[in-house]
């Protein structure tokens, strides 16, 4: 049995707002260096697709405020422009918010910052390392606890099969 969203839920249209963010100097330099090496790797037909994908993922990580080194260590940039902009956006609203992030490190970074600013009970997260029970409790808390304003998660874990009506 399949039910389409348009047949059962009256949802407002999606709104997309694009914001341009200027990288701080340290982040910009790292991005440019990685971009130059990525271009060399991407143009090389002898390099595997996995290596090419790794280069692109590193660029994405830098754009998100951190870099996972080849030895697995995660290095955060001193200033995270995207996180700063997110906090600015969230200051504009008192409503509940769902924040999707692609990397576990981003989810943890966002959750930590929101906890510092709004209180640790104001935010829950859902991502792959969490058991189904832990995820369900987080969603339940977000849906029914007025003090819990933010759900930070990975769209592959929480993008389907969840009812998140608490956020506008």
What feature does the model see in each segment?
Residues 1-95:
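Inter-lobe coupling linker of SF2 helicases/translocases
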Residues 30, 106-113, 163:
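Phosphate- and divalent-cation-binding pockets in alpha/beta enzyme and binding domains
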Residues 66, 104, 130:
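Short, glycine/serine-rich, charged loops/turns that create anion-binding
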Residues 79-87, 104, 135-139:
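Short, well-ordered alpha-helical scaffold segments within catalytic/effector domains
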Residues 98-100, 108-158:
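Conserved helicase ATPase core of P-loop NTP-dependent helicases/translocases
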Residues 162-168:
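A short beta-strand element within the Helicase C-terminal
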């Amino acid at each position: 049995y399949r039910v389409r969203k348009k047949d059962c839920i009256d949802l407002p249209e999606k709104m997309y707002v694009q914001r341009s963010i200027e990288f701080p100097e340290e982040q910009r330099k790292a991005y440019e260096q990685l971009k130059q090496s990525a271009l060399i790797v991407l143009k090389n037909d002898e390099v595997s697709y996995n290596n090419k994908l790794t280069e692109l993922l590193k660029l994405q990580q830098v754009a998100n405020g951190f870099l996972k080194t080849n030895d697995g260590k995660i290095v955060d940039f001193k200033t995270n422009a995207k996180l700063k902009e997110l906090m600015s956006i969230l200051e504009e609203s008192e409503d509940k918010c769902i924040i999707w992030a692609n990397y576990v490190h981003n989810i943890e970074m966002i959750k930590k910052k929101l906890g510092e600013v709004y209180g640790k009970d104001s935010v829950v997260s859902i991502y792959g390392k969490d058991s189904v029970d832990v995820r369900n409790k987080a969603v339940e808390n977000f849906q029914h606890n007025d003090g819990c304003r933010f759900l930070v998660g990975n769209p592959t874990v929480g993008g389907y099969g969840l009812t998140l009506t608490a956020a506008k």
